[in-house]
């Protein structure tokens, strides 16, 4: 069973995350940040990861702690659920169009966290959501999930479309990387023998 439950409580946020990597993309995400919930829903649906996220954050200050800390907890849950990575494909990529936006994501569930982010968002806000928080989320997810993650905007003029294409492309890349390879069901996908 590739599942995990993570709770994380600080002076800034109180978070619970439950995921099932072998799900169907069922989600119930409530962080108090509407646009972010919409993006988490996309991540769940397109990665086929069942996901429940609850966050009570210091939104009276701003959305930063909520978004970053959910990324931390979700990354921790991903790392726990995938375990020793035995039998997974490991690599995934996706080139995803959404209207004017075209975003490419490529990732390696390597245990070596690294983010390369080349996604310019033309506006500072999407509604009330600070667009710089999109990168903050993926930095936290990559760091705590042990992902090498490259995300690149190839086209786009609408910030909402670009951000959503980023979440969807990462989701599709995750979906591919998390698949189990029936030919290597008990093998670690590395010549080193561990990841």
UniProtKB/Swiss-Prot annotation:
Keyword Magnesium attached: no
Domain of life of the native organism: Bacteria
Main location: cytoplasm
Pfam families recorded: IGPD
GO-annotated molecular function: imidazoleglycerol-phosphate dehydratase activity
GO cellular component, one term: cytoplasm
Entry's localization field: Cytoplasm
BP-aspect Gene Ontology terms: L-histidine biosynthetic process
InterPro entries: IGPD_sf, ImidazoleglycerolP_deHydtase, ImidazoleglycerP_deHydtase_CS, Ribosomal_Su5_D2-typ_SF
Keyword Amino-acid biosynthesis attributed: yes
Pathway membership: Amino-acid biosynthesis; L-histidine biosynthesis; L-histidine from 5-phospho-alpha-D-ribose 1-diphosphate: step 6/9
Root EC class: lyase
Sorted UniProt keywords: Amino-acid biosynthesis, Cytoplasm, Histidine biosynthesis, Lyase
NCBIfam families xref list: PRK00951.1-5 (NF002109), PRK00951.2-1 (NF002111), PRK00951.2-4 (NF002114)
Annotated family: Belongs to the imidazoleglycerol-phosphate dehydratase family.
Name of protein: Imidazoleglycerol-phosphate dehydratase
Species the sequence originates in: Dinoroseobacter shibae (strain DSM 16493 / NCIMB 14021 / DFL 12)
Lineage: Bacteria, Pseudomonadati, Pseudomonadota, Alphaproteobacteria, Rhodobacterales
Chain's gene name: hisB
